[in-house]
């Protein structure tokens, strides 16, 4: 893998410097250039008490970017969370609206915010998942795998606790990782995403995998009942319930609140004590929900779910 470091401008103005030592960088000099051999540069996000870095790697002859947030309480044997942006979006925007930094500071894990590439047919950022992204030749699964290898080289991580979550297209990509990078992904949560027919039809994980779906009945972008390029949420849940050999009848918990509430279905008695869970919110649209305008807080819900599992199932 050829690593390239640069201080970049990607649709926004970024400033680098300060904030601790960079992975692969023993120097305090952050004035690097395109010829530097350093893989990452400190990035002043102004969010969280930990350290943020911006990194560039070359994968499949394309320069790819990702951000690393190292929680302030990071120690050895840390878990890894990939947080994937939606279609037309940016990794930095995802960093801002998810707010995983504060949770990472408390729990001591590392968050990775990768950046998708431009879909040639639309000129919009995307993850290659089939469906409406058909025609893309970007190897996003390989890109995520290469990030994992890089992080494993630079940090002390627990390779049995690598997770993915994402909004919309990022949720679709998280499911694709659970299918196509199953040997490394322990569990995933999709927020307002689903599975494309291509992912659904070819999915063959190597182990029982805990998954959760957070979705709104008012979502007009990724309809709960599916579309030509998106499987209905019920079919997605049924797929994972069947693959994990879960009980077919869920425990249903009502989610009460001032914004319409919802239901939380839990499918248990699955292989390796994994679980399949659905949070279906009555008045939620195509959003990353929080308590300000919904009756669920996505980021804490995501971490509370994922952190219970490793690649072998429920953590004892």
Which residues does each PLM region occupy?
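Acidic catalytic loop of the alpha/beta-hydrolase fold
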Residues: 218-222, 286-288
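A domain-start/cap signature at the N-terminus of enzymes
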Residues: 16-80, 92, 96, 106, ...
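Serine-hydrolase catalytic machinery in alpha/beta-hydrolase-like enzymes
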Residues: 56-163, 172-176, 180, 202, ...
């Amino acid at each position: 893998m050829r690593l390239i470091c640069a201080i970049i401008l990607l649709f926004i103005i970024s400033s680098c410097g300060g904030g601790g030592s960079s992975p692969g960088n023993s120097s305090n000099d952050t004035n690097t250039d395109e010829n530097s051999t350093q893989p990452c540069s400190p990035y002043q996000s102004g969010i969280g008490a930990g350290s943020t870095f911006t990194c560039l790697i070359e994968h499949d002859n394309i320069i790819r970017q990702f951000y690393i947030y190292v929680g302030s309480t990071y120690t050895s044997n840390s878990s890894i969370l990939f947080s994937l942006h939606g279609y037309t979006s940016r990794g930095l925007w995802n960093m801002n609206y998810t707010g995983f930094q504060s949770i990472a500071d408390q729990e001591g894990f590392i968050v990775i915010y990768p950046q998708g590439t431009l879909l040639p047919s639309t000129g919009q950022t995307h993850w290659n998942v089939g469906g409406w992204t058909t025609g893309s030749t970007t190897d996003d699964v390989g890109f995520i795998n290469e990030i994992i290898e890089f992080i494993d080289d630079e940090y002390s991580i627990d390779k049995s606790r690598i997770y993915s979550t994402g909004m919309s297209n990022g949720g679709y990509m998280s499911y694709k990782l659970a299918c196509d990078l199953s040997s490394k992904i322990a569990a995933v949560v999709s927020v307002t995403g689903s599975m494309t027919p291509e992912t659904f039809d070819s999915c063959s994980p190597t182990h029982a995998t805990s998954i959760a779906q957070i979705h709104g009945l008012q979502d007009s972008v990724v309809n709960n009942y599916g579309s030509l390029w998106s499987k209905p949420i019920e079919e997605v849940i049924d797929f994972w319930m069947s693959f994990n050999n879960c009980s077919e009848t869920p425990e249903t918990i009502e989610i009460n609140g001032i914004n319409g509430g919802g239901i939380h279905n839990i499918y248990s008695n699955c292989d390796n004590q994994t679980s399949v869970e659905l949070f279906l919110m009555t008045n939620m649209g195509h959003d990353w929900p929080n308590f300000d305008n919904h009756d669920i807080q996505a980021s804490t819900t995501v971490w509370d779910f994922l952190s219970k599992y490793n690649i072998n199932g429920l953590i004892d």
